[in-house]
């Protein structure tokens, strides 16, 4: 199996909510590696996010998503009466329109078998064998993936890669602690027009 396993992903509307956002739900301008990893697990029907620890992902943006802001009703139950007006408040949320990107998968350092790369290969070759549920989303359950398909690139082609950079302005999670924030792991990035190189790969790990 080839080490380079590229997929083209298209999502009409998405919000990659910043981890520290509260009343105003700001979005990251690009999908974080942790979010893309979750989508790939869902694609193959895997519910254990630890199953493919060690996989490496490389993400390249093909579009510059348009940002907009919507207002919606956010409910939290402070009063027993569900219709009490104090249980609802306006919630502003940023949305991205037309998110298109490439994700390359490298399972050479995974320990479990079959690897995520092998399972994705099987999902596209024999989709009837995949046991999964729900729509395929990128982030929130509302943000359905419109298309995910095999893609062909060469290692010397230039794309706008999400590149690790200690001075980068994008701080994104590659592993999320859903119980609290203490276990969430971060990496700094910048978008760089380049060919595939070691700095564009992010390994999914818990440390």
Language-model segments: residues:
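Primarily extracytoplasmic ectodomains and periplasmic/lumenal surface modules that are beta-strand-rich
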Residues: 14-15, 46-47, 110-113
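N-terminal, Lys/Arg- and Ser/Thr-rich interaction peptides
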Residues: 1-21
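Solvent-exposed loop and beta-edge segments used for protein-protein assembly and interaction
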Residues: 1, 51-53, 95-97
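Internal, well-folded beta-alpha domain core
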Residues: 64-207
């Amino acid at each position: 199996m080839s080490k380079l396993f590229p997929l083209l992903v298209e999502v009409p509307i998405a919000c990659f909510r910043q981890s520290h956002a509260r009343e105003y739900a700001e979005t990251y301008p690009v999908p974080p590696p942790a979010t893309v990893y979750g989508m790939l697990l869902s694609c193959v029907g895997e519910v254990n996010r630890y199953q493919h620890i060690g996989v490496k992902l490389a993400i390249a943006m093909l579009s510059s998503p348009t940002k907009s802001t919507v207002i919606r009703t956010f409910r939290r139950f402070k009063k027993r009466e569900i219709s009490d007006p104090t249980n609802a408040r306006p919630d502003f949320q940023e949305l991205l329109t037309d998110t298109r990107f490439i994700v390359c998968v490298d399972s050479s350092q995974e320990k479990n078998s079959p690897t995520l790369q092998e399972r994705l290969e099987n999902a596209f070759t024999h989709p009837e064998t995949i046991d999964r549920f729900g729509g395929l989303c990128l982030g929130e359950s509302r943000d359905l993936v419109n298309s995910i398909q095999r893609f062909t690139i060469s290692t010397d082609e230039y794309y706008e890669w999400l590149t690790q950079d200690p001075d980068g302005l994008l701080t994104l999670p590659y592993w999320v602690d859903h119980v609290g924030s203490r276990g969430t792991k971060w990496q700094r990035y910048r978008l760089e027009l380049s060919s595939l190189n070691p700095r564009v790969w992010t390994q999914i790990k818990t440390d």
